From Swiss-Prot:
Keywords: Cell inner membrane, Cell membrane, Copper, Membrane, Plasmid, Transmembrane, Transmembrane helix. Its main location: membrane. The chain crosses the membrane at residues 11-31, 46-66, 92-112, 119-139, 157-177, 201-221, 233-253, 282-302. InterPro entries: CopC/D (IPR032694), CopD (IPR047689), Cu-R_CopD_dom (IPR008457). The lineage of its organism: Bacteria, Pseudomonadati, Pseudomonadota, Gammaproteobacteria, Pseudomonadales. This is Copper resistance protein D. Exact function not known. Involved in copper resistance. Appears to be involved in copper uptake in conjunction with CopC. Belongs to the CopD family. It is a multi-pass membrane protein. One of its GO terms (biological process) is copper ion transport. GO terms for cellular component: plasma membrane. The gene is copD. It is found in: Cell inner membrane. Pfam families: CopD (PF05425). It comes from Pseudomonas syringae pv. actinidiae.
Amino acid sequence: MADPLSIALRFALYTDLMVLFGLALFGLYSLRGTERQSGAVLNFKLLLTGTAVLGALLSLAALLQMTKAMSGATEWEELFPHIKMMLAETEVGVSWNVRMAALAMIAVAGLLTSRSPTGSLWVVTALSGVALATLAWTGHGAMDEGSRRFWHFATDIVHLFAAGGWVGALVAFALLLRAKKVDNHGSVKILARTLTGFESAGGVIVATILVTGIVNYLFIVGPQLDSLADTTYGWLLMAKLVLFTAMIGLASLNRFRLSPHLEHSIGHGDYTGAAKALRWSMATELAAAVVVLGLIAWLGTLSPEVEMAMQ
C-alpha cells in the first residue's frame, strides 16, 4: 500500500483537475452569452486560474513524492538526478510535462474570461481535458501492453472526463446555491434553468461512468468477484459502489422532485424553502463525491492481483 501522503496528493490532484475541467465545461453547456463572463454568474477568472495554479503545485508535490518513493532518496542532492531521469525518460514524466504546460496555458486563458468568455472557456475545457487525461498514466492502465494498454487508457480517460463533468457540475451548483445567490430572483431563475439543462448531460455522464467503470474493472480484475471479497481493494471498491449508488439516488431526487419543485416555487414567488432543500441535497451529493474521489485515489495505489495471489 502507498503511504498516506501519496494517496492524499493523488486525491487532491484528482479533485482539482476534475473541478477545473467540469467547471469550464459547465460554463459552455449550461450558461448563455454574457452569463459566461467572469463574475456574471460564476467568477471564472478566480476559479479557473486559481484551480490551475493549485493543480500545478499539486503536480509538483506529487512528482517529488513519487520520485522519492521510487528512488529511496532522502536528500535533495540525491533526489534531483532521479527527478531529471523521471521527467526525461519515463512516460509518467512526459505526461507530467504535458500537464504542466496545459495548466500554465489554462492560468493565462482563465484571466481572459472577462474579455472573451466563450473562447476562453473553450480553451480551458480543451486544455483541462488534456491535463485530466494525463492522470491515466498514473493508473492501472500503465501496466498493460499493446492494444490492451491502448483500450485501457482510452477507457480510463473517458471515465475521467465523465467523472470530471459530474464533479464540476456539483461544484457549480453548490456555488449557485449559496445563500446570497438564492436571495436574487434573477440568479434563482438561472439556477432553475441550468438544473433543467443538466438533466440530459447528467444522464449521459452517469451512463458513461457505469459503462467505463465496468470495462475498467474487467481490465484490472477480470470477470471474477469471489476472490476479491477478502481484499482491501475489494472492500474499497464496494464502498465506492455504495456511495456512487447513493449519488445516483440523490441526483434522481434532484431531477424528479427538488428541481421541479424549485421551478414551481419560482412561479409562485416563494422559493426559499425549495432552494434550501436543494442546497442540502447537493451538499450531500458533493460530500459523497469527495469521499468517492478519496477512494479512487486509494484504489489506484493497490494491486488486486497481488492481494488475491496472497490469499
